[in-house]
Amino acid sequence: MDFEKIEQAYTYLLENVQIIQNDLATSFYDALIEQNGIYLDGQTALEQVKKNNQALKRLALRKEEWLRTYQFLLMKAAQTEPLQANHQFTPDAVGHLMIFIIEQLFPAENVSLLELGSGMGILGASFLTSMNKKIDYLGIELDDLL
C-alpha cells in the first residue's frame, strides 16, 4: 500500500468536496456523493474538480488504497459534520474479525455474502479487499444518504 498515493488522493478528494460544497451550498456528505458522480461520468463545469479527478485517475489506486482514502475522508467529515449513530462506519478491527471468522467457518474457495444494512460499505469493502477467497457480495442499504 502506497501511503503517498493515499495522501495525494485524499488531498484531491477533499479539495473537490470543498469546492462542490461551496458551489452547491450543501453538506460535506452530499458534496462527496456529487464528487463520486462527477468522478464516474466527468460531467461538471468546475474546472478544478475536473483537473483533480484526472490526477486521481492517474494515481491508479488499488482497492485497498481507495478504501483507506475514503476512510480518512470520512474521518475528516466527521470532525466538521457529526454523523448520526446509524451512519457510523465499521472499524477495521471488526472487519478483520469478521474475515477471520468467515475464513475459519467456511473453508470453501467461493463464498456468497449478503449484508443487510450495508451502510457506507466499509465492511463490504474490507471483505472484498482482504479475504483470500472468491467472493460474491451483495450489500443492501435503504438509507439513500449512505
Name these PLM-found stretches.
Residues 109-119:
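Conserved class I S-adenosyl-L-methionine
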Residues 136-141:
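Conserved SAM-binding motif I beta-strand of class I
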Residues 120-133:
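Conserved SAM-binding loop of SAM-dependent methyltransferases across substrates and taxa
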Residues 80-93:
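Class I SAM-dependent methyltransferase Rossmann-like catalytic core
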Residues 145:
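Conserved Rossmann-like nucleotide-cofactor binding loop
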Residues 73-81, 102, 106:
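Generic hydrophobic/packing signal
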